Amino acid sequence: FKNKKYLDLDKDIIWPHINKKKIKGQIFDDQIFDIGDGINEFNLAKKKINKILKKPCCFLDRDGVINYDYGYVGKIKTFKWMPGVKKAIRYLNKKNYYVIIVTNQAGIAYGYYSEKDFYNLNSYIRSNLSEGKTYLDKIYFCPYHIRSKIKKYKKNSQLRKPGTGMLKKAFKDFHILKSKSFLIGDKISDALC
């Protein structure tokens, strides 16, 4: 293959290995796209694949939506699930929605808990959900606040809701169907973003 500029999957890889009985197969009901030999076919296949991969997203605020908000919940010992949330996330997973948390975390900016505490809590949340075959696709957070006493967190950030920074990151990172997506929050800042 070293001398060839382009490889043809069928001609150069699959058929020679079939003839040598060095290839195994498995039947799938999914679609496959042959992107052909040219850039036009590649671009067409890319568009089709992106369309297939796009799916709606349910964005969730965290405190007050998935857990009780006792004020600055940043550690496992202060986290308590809201009733029905795990079941709702499982339903969204089964309906082929991305489920993404977008959460302001001023408690980090104020020094009530650390980013490490926050990540430990995320691990606990994910682990707890996985017991019920439920999952989150991503957790985005904003640790910044203009009134922070900690220099590295003291700033005005578009990540902080009602800014749209976390949503923009999600749209960049995932194939999200915007027209069918929604956000569930408990504050005006959630609705405004």
Model-derived features: positions:
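Catalytic-core segments of class I nucleotidyltransferases/pyrophosphorylases
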Residues: 1-49
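Catalytic phosphate/metal-binding cores of nucleic-acid and nucleotide-processing enzymes, i.e., regions
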Residues: 78, 188-192
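Substrate-recognition element of Asp-dependent hydrolases with the DxDx(T/V) motif
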Residues: 85, 89-125, 135-145
